[in-house]
Amino acid sequence: MKKIPPITSDRLPEKLKAIRERLNLSQSEILDRIGFGEFLFRSNISQYERGVRVPAPAVILAYARLARVDVAKLIDDKLNIS
């Protein structure tokens, strides 16, 4: 049986950074606001925003909830967050 491919979004890094900047938060502050401060480092946020690392689905969902946007707007490259 084949595995379902992971979610990939070329625009996810820019959308995550846009959310953080729209909320006027530093990378350390957003880490605490999304509730993963004890599990991740500021460098993880930097890697997500640069597209070096893909965040776990729970992190993507936390960003969506914080920004009050549908999670589909984060993972679908055809949709904008604003």
Where are these regions (language model features)?
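A short, Lys/Arg-rich alpha-helix, primarily the initiator
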Residues: 1-23, 32, 72
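Short alpha-helical DNA-recognition segment
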Residues: 24-47
